[in-house]
Each structure stands twice: as structure tokens, then as C-alpha cells.
Amino acid sequence: MNKNKNIGIILAGGVGSRMGLGYPKQFSKIAGKTALEHTLAIFQEHKEIDEIIIVSERTSYRRIEDIVSKLDFSKVNRIIFGGKERSDSTLSAITALQDEPENTKLIIHDAVRPLLATEIISECIAKLDKYNAVDVAIPAVDTIVHVNNDTQEIIKIPKRAEYYQGQTPQAFKLGTLKKAYDIYTQGGIEGTCDCSIVLKTLPEERVGIVSGSETNIKLTRPVDLFIADKLFQSRSHFSLRNITSIDRLYDMKDQVLVVIGGSYGIGAHIIDIAKKFGIKTYSLSRSNGVDVGDVKSIEKAFAEIYAKEHKIDHIVNTAAVLNHKTLVSMSYEEILTSINVNYTGMINAVITAYPYLKQTHGSFLGFTSSSYTRGRPFYAIYSSAKAAVVNLTQAISEEWLPDNIKINCVNPERTKTPMRTKAFGIEPEGTLLDAKTVAFASLVVLASRETGNIIDVVLKDEEYITNILADLYK
């Protein structure tokens, strides 16, 4: 017997008048992709989502169709027209699903909430085993004020602890939502969202609550784009296990991976772990005559690998140098070396990588440091170069988007590497990430659909990754 489907419904019918962009806000760019692309990727990657329906505003239909086709969102099985109001768009989706079983689970989400965590989708799906309607909400933080809009006076201030702020997704059994809309369309009822329509038309139904997230913001005002971009810059809210299925690493078998700086530290561990998945690996470093600061050196090395393999699928640049000194105490040679390795080298690698990754629709991965958010004393060149790497990653992600090349940057917490030990000496056990953890996380990012993102790897990821590595090295 076939299980009932879990269908994601993405509401992308808004015109974004409050945003003032001159185009629908679902097409606003954040971290190298449109808000809609980010949202679709979340549902596409979710194991429990079987199909996706996009509800589109009529003038946006072709653009959405192009996005779905170009980025291979294979779970999208139809794009339908919405209406003037949100309820019109939901009704359009219900009508399109009239032949589906009543127990089909619908997960309805705003296209302009691109920072949704996948565990919220999972919790909504699970909660529908107990309820026929589920909302996502977070506790209200600010005081709620009931106002008379005519007089602009306060009527009352309710008890804040009893109030939550609604988000999406909202989830329903198809039969329940269909029944609610049958009553709603007869007129006489106002509803601001699908859950409110269920509550007003079917008062006997209990609506369950799933805890939302403060980062699951809706793009409504210009400032929201700024906030969303900052959240994408620092993906601390975004668990690595949400980026991709580990199974996708096995799909990388026989792909060609080049690691610049692969002779020791994180780079060496990337090489070692990649081999466990059957990935063909090449390490480039000074020890085999490759200088990341010399573009000719990189060009020669890439050409030799291509001549042998006839393709390059992934390139990782881990090369770095850290001088733990004040700027004025560094020699000019040390300053130039630091810039050449930490920033110019990244540029050299990106430029040289482009034609190879364009051919394979491959991916590039760089490394930054937590120091990119604020310059650090005693390693001013290093921290400023890492800030430059972040900006370069975000800029190149947009330049490379038409060629379907992914570029991301891993931002590990303090990690136990030979470079760090040389700069800072021996540090207390348990305060540093293991280089293997960062290496595995890097491969997970390479295997994902992500682009233009700065992805944190933190100590709390270590247990999750250590367990996977233990199985891998049995």
C-alpha cells in the first residue's frame, strides 16, 4: 500500500510592494541566490517531502519555470497560478490537488522565508499524525498592544506570555483544509492565514503548534534583506546535517577533487576522507612544487590533472599562513607572503578553476576564519584577508550562477592544526575542533546545492561528525 504523500506548497505569488524593489520580493538576491531558490532548495533536499507545488503570480510564471528547470528542482511537479489574496493562492493549490487522498499532508510555506530549518518541516509532518492542522510560531518578545486605529489610543495590553508570533510553514491534512475552504468560500468569514480559516470554519479542530525560529524571518521590508544576508553569512543557525544527505558523498565516487594545501592539516584530512568515498584526489602544495601565490604554478598543476582525468569536479583551497605578530613588527616580506597566500592565492585558484568547473558544473570551497567578522590584533593581515575571502566568495557566487558553479566558504571555529599550534602553542584539550571534523564538514558542503554561503563548523557539530567518521573508518 502506498503511503500518503507529503507535499510542499510554496506560495510565491506576492508582488512585494512594501519592499519597494520594483520586482517581486521572492526574486530578491541573498547570498548568491534568489529567496525562492533558497526556499525551493530546502524542500528539494528534505527527505520527507515527496512533491513540491509552486503557486505563482502570473507575470512571474516564466521566470519561476526557468529557475526550476535550470537548477533541476526535480520534486517540483507543477507551477500553478495564485490569486490576489493569500487565501486565493491556497485555494488554487487545493483545487490542483483534488484527486489526492484526504490524508495527504500539505506543508504550506512562504517563498520569502528562505531561512527555514529543515527540522521544522520534519516536526510539522510528524505533528500531523496527531492533529489535522499545525502552525509554526515563536513566543512574542515585544509587548503586544491592542490599539484603536481611529483614535490611535491603546485599548488594552494583553498578557504577553499567552501570545505567540505566527510563522510558516503551516501544515494540514488535505481533507481538513479542503473542508475549511468549502465553508470559507461561501462568504462571511475573514481569515488572515490558513490556520485562522480552519479555526473559524471548523471550531472543533485543534491546531497544534511547532516551535519556530527567530531566524525564520519573512522578507517584508528593505531591512529584512540586510538581516537575511547577515544570517546567511553566518550559518550558525544552520546545522550541517541539514545541508545534504550523507548519501550524496557516495554519489561523488570517481569525481575528481583537487585540494590546494593538501599536504597537512585540514587539507590532508579532506584528501583522506574523500578517498573513503571513492573520490579521486589530488593534493597541491609547496611540497610538490605548487605555490598558491603564483598563478602560473596553479595553471600548470590544473592542466596536468585535467590531461590525466579529462575533468575536474571540485576544488578546495585550504592554503593559509598565520603570523602571530603586530603589523609593525612584521617584515615587508612576511606581509607580502601573508597577502599572497591568504588572499591573492584564493583569487588565483578561483580564476584558474573557472573553465574546469564550468565544464563539470562543479564546486569550489574556500576557508575563512571567525576573525573575518572583526579584525584581530596580532594577526591583522590574516583577519583582513579572511574578510576579503568572504566577500570574494559571495561576489563570485553571483558571477558563476549562470554557469551553475557552486562556491562556498567554510568558517571553522578554532581548529587544532599545525598552523594554529605554531602560532598559539599548545591549547587546552576540548577547546579546539578536530581537523577531521572540519574536513568532513567541508566535503558535506561540496556535495550540497549550497552556493554563496559562509558555513560555520562549530564544536557542537563534532559529536555528530565523529560518529559518522567512526563508522567510516571501521
Swiss-Prot record:
Q: Which CDD domains match?
A: CDP-ME_synthetase, SDR_c
The superkingdom of the source organism is: Bacteria
Mind listing the GO biological process terms from this record?
capsule polysaccharide biosynthetic process; isopentenyl diphosphate biosynthetic process, methylerythritol 4-phosphate pathway
The reaction(s) catalysed by this protein are: D-ribitol 5-phosphate + CTP + H(+) = CDP-L-ribitol + diphosphate; D-ribitol 5-phosphate + NADP(+) = D-ribulose 5-phosphate + NADPH + H(+)
Give the EC number(s) listed in the UniProt record.
2.7.7.40, 1.1.1.405
> Does the record carry Oxidoreductase as a key word?
yes
Q: Region annotation Ribulose-5-phosphate reductase: residue ranges?
A: 250-474
Give the multimer and partner information. Monomer.
The free-text function statement in the UniProt record for this protein reads: Catalyzes the NADPH-dependent reduction of D-ribulose 5-phosphate to D-ribitol 5-phosphate and the further reaction of D-ribitol 5-phosphate with CTP to form CDP-ribitol.
| Record's protein name | Bifunctional ribulose 5-phosphate reductase/CDP-ribitol pyrophosphorylase Bcs1
Annotated source species:
Haemophilus influenzae
Gene that this sequence comes from: bcs1
